[in-house]
UniProtKB/Swiss-Prot annotation:
GO terms for cellular component: nuclear periphery; nucleolus; preribosome, large subunit precursor. Residues 8-20 have a biased composition (Acidic residues). The lineage of its organism: Eukaryota, Metazoa, Chordata, Craniata, Vertebrata. Its main location: nucleus. Belongs to the EBP2 family. GO terms for biological process: ribosomal large subunit biogenesis; rRNA processing. It is found in: Nucleus, Nucleolus. Residues 1-32, 211-312 are annotated as: Disordered. Residues 282-312 have a biased composition (Basic residues). This is Probable rRNA-processing protein EBP2. It comes from the Eukaryota. Pfam families: Ebp2. Required for the processing of the 27S pre-rRNA. It comes from Xenopus laevis. Residues 140-176 form a coiled coil.
Amino acid sequence: MLHHEDESSPESDSDFDASELTDKELQEAFSQGKLKPGLNVVLEGKKKPFNDASGLKQSLKDLKNELPWVERLDVTVDPVVDTTGQNGQTDPNTSDINAEDDFQREMCFYRQAQAAVLYSLPRLRKLKVATKRPDDYFAEMAKTDQHMQKIRHKLQLKQASMEKSEKAKQLRALRKYGKKVQVEVLQKRQKEKSAMVTQIKKYQKGLSDKLDFLEGDQTPKKTPNKTGGSAAAQKAKNTPSAKRRYKDQKFGFGGKKKGSKGNTKGSYNDVSGFRGSVAHGKGPHRPGKKGGKNANKRPGKNVRQKMKSKRR
């Protein structure tokens, strides 16, 4: 209980002080006649602003000190010209720099600081002011190298994310274009398929005597003039198509097929398979004839039975 009272006592004291301070303000307002029925404090109107130019100039004169440049070290310079052009800028005009681009903004600060150093160092040397630290001097930078490395890493990550987002936009555009091309290709294939089915139906019904898609030429052939035409064109016209030649090779030319390969003049005159040695019995073997060198030497039935009984 005591501990609880100790903890709550500062809060109660502060509340009491605030209320006491408020009461004092109310008493002062009442004594000044600012309190009226329905109001705690009379609201005063807005104060009219006024421009005291002479007073401001006098204050500036009191604050201003005509000190030498060594004591002030203030310079007003433009950024160094970016000769590399890596940031898309080759002149010192800073109006073209995009303030939202972190790299351009930081590079502008760097170039302006570089210009200030190039302007100030010769003047300091002329005034014989040391510009290099002694060997035993040690002072930490306002921002450590680790902090600057973190900033650099953060800027690089931001730049990489921007490039990644740009690539994603390009990929989305390419996908849209690819889908469009794919739809066009599918429509073209469907159109070709419909045309092929129509040609097949016409061919089955006898309305057409050729199928162009089998020949690989779906473009209509130009008919030569009746009055002229080259000899090669006439020969190509009289030559049967590849489909016709394949069917002729497979099924023949129509008509009777049975017995067409024997007892004809061509087969009678064909002596390519004739062998004289076999025809006149001079060959090594004449089937159907007993005796000779290759006669059947199989033992008789009785001999075979005796041989069989001996084996048992």
